[in-house]
């Protein structure tokens, strides 16, 4: 099989772990076609899920069933990143283009009033969208959000840069092992991450931190869920900044989670938090 075929096969293998009845749709936007996986009751409150960079909508496989029990779940492959979205339209130059892309997605799917959750890079996109269009959202959940309330760890950024010097097939696993202290527990997910070494992405937008005055003014009810063992940033520092900048937000820490273990590994506690928050 070609390298791209290996990645697509691994993607399909993870998809088999999703709830019965999950549907894949391709949504047109000015930036290109966006792949969205949909499940849950048609009359449920919509819940949009944005994954961390390089993980695709498949990252939510361990959460989809719990979240789809009462919500219409829309799990998105980020435009410009790995997955089955096709970035063949307007260029992605900055955060404004990602909010415009998400606006177009909300328009096409009639998602006004939807809840929104994101992990890592997806959390940064989600927060920027909440600041841009708070009237479009119900509630917002940010899972170990990077570049939202405090800077990323220079050591993490250096390790990520050094990882690019390794053979392509070793890169995803090397960063996960360093950050989490082990390989992914699920062999199917482990194979998927290895497969991303062969995947293609067009553009991952750089991540300026939001303005503090904008964060303080954000009216969207927000959950900030941090990984206590995250090496992407200093979790206590992020928690303190989140409480200072968004005093109405609920800020919790999962003490045994790492940045890269979210949202896939040992998901029971995370699922309970999200289900309760979005209820």
What are these language model-derived features?
Residues 30-83:
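Conserved HGGG/HGGXW glycine-rich cap/lid loop of the alpha/beta-hydrolase fold
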Residues 151-156, 166-220:
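Conserved alpha/beta-hydrolase catalytic His-Asp/Glu region
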Residues 223-258:
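Conserved loop-alpha-helix segment in the C-terminal half of the alpha/beta-hydrolase fold
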Residues 257-267:
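Catalytic histidine-centered segment of alpha/beta-hydrolase-like enzymes
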